[in-house]
Amino acid sequence: TTERYVAYVDNLARQGYIVLRSDYRGHGFSEGQASGGYGSPAYTIDVLNAVAAIKAYPDADPNRIGMWGHSMGGHITLRSMVVTNDIKAGVIWGGVVASYPDLMYNWRRPDAGPTNTPDPTNPRRRWRDELVETYGSPEDNPQFWASISPNAYVSEISGPVQLHHGTNDTSVPFEFSQLLFNEMHAAGQPVEIFLWEGDDHNITTYFT
């Protein structure tokens, strides 16, 4: 939640870190159209621009930039660490860090509401249908789906990654983090995983 993010940022700042918390385009006070983080590179571009801004900040050490991402932000963090070597370490909480076939077939985050079912009219959910219509399904065109999945490039991740996930997360399966841990470990990449027993998507029991 926004309130918790403020607390996290405050704590990091008190520890001496320079912290920049981004609002993706179309979110918060940012301009532009919200496009979602899975069917478009837009949010990743926004974050990479933020990294470039931090590198230019006089008091920042450009060789010690880390990134923390929660939920969709975990997906963006993973993507960003594949794209650039500027991010030296990543921490991901409750991250949407599975391959695209898993996101297509093994993840349906319910919308809030009385029916608790996905809303097909939600523009942030249309990415599945639009990509399949344009490029075919993962079975029909596995090369395309691998090409847009950061999981296919774990050997190129720019630094160590620490994964955190509550085992009672009803928004993003904790198995996604387990799979990424296994992929990175198999690739010889430095990675840690912490599974918080019985905790939720925000890991509110252990981090309050």
Where in the sequence are the language-model features?
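Short glycine-enriched nucleophile-adjacent loop
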Residues: 74-85
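Short beta-strand/loop motif that positions the catalytic acidic residue
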Residues: 157, 163-165, 169
